[in-house]
């Protein structure tokens, strides 16, 4: 289990490295070029030895695909990770995808074969497993058809309007980091408008530290649904 600078979780555990999404701003690809987690970033690799990290007894909020996209995982990889999650309900688990339709199909298949997924991901009631969709543009927001626990709008690349019926319980918002050519510097009004939309739907907002200077006194970090009480 790795400590992380990601400010909305306690730690990361990556059982898969690599992602075929080919995002220009992908920090995972940059890290892979330096540390060589997998041979070809566009071809995800399975690291089953990392499953043992879930068995840590100290409760944590764990991001399980910071170096991949869970929607691109093979079915058997997802099932093995679900096994480890169900066996270790002391933690809270968070996953992000740009491919919610593919992930939904895999989860439906898993749920049809086992009842214990409801223990961590019930239709109603407290969850121990949280799924979010990563969006950065209006086109991506418009394409969402799935109900999820949160949107991660990082990096925010342009103004975004979320249909009121699609607004999730939580928005995580962040600016692009790094030094990519063409890096987008967000405008404060883009973030202000997302906050207004969230407030109208009684949704929480968590701004990443990358927005602190831009937002000034309007910087905001509401309590996260997966926060571990200490």
What do these predicted ranges mean?
Residues 1-129, 138-144, 160-165:
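Conserved Radical SAM active-site core
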Residues 1-8, 157, 162-230:
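Auxiliary Fe-S-binding modules of radical SAM enzymes
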Residues 61-63, 92-94, 128-132, 148-152, ...:
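Structural preference for beta-strand elements that scaffold enzyme active sites
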Residues 67-69, 98-100, 134-138, 154-158, ...:
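Active-site beta-loop-alpha junctions enriched in small/polar residues
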């Amino acid at each position: 289990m790795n400590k992380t600078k990601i400010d909305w979780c306690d730690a990361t555990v990556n059982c898969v490295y690599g992602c075929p999404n080919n995002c220009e701003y992908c920090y995972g690809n940059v890290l892979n070029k330096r540390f060589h987690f997998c041979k070809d970033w566009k071809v995800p690799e399975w690291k089953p030895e990392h499953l043992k990290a879930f068995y840590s007894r100290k409760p944590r909020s764990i991001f399980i695909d910071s170096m991949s996209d869970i929607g691109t995982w093979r079915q058997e990889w997802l099932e093995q990770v679900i096994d480890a999650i169900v066996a270790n309900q002391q933690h809270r688990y968070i996953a992000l995808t740009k491919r919610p339709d593919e992930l939904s199909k895999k989860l439906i298949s898993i749920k049809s074969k086992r009842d214990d997924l409801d223990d961590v991901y019930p239709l109603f009631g407290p969850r121990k497993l949280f799924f979010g969709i990563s969006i950065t543009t209006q086109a991506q927001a418009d394409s969402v058809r799935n109900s999820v626990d949160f949107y991660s709008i990082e990096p925010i690349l342009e103004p975004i309007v979320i249909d009121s019926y699609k607004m999730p319980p939580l928005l995580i918002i962040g600016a692009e980091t790094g030094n990519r050519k063409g890096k987008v510097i967000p405008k404060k009004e883009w973030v202000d408008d997302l906050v207004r939309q969230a407030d109208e739907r009684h949704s929480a907002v968590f701004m990443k530290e990358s927005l602190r200077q831009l937002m000034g006194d309007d910087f905001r970090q509401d309590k996260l649904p997966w926060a571990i009480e200490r």
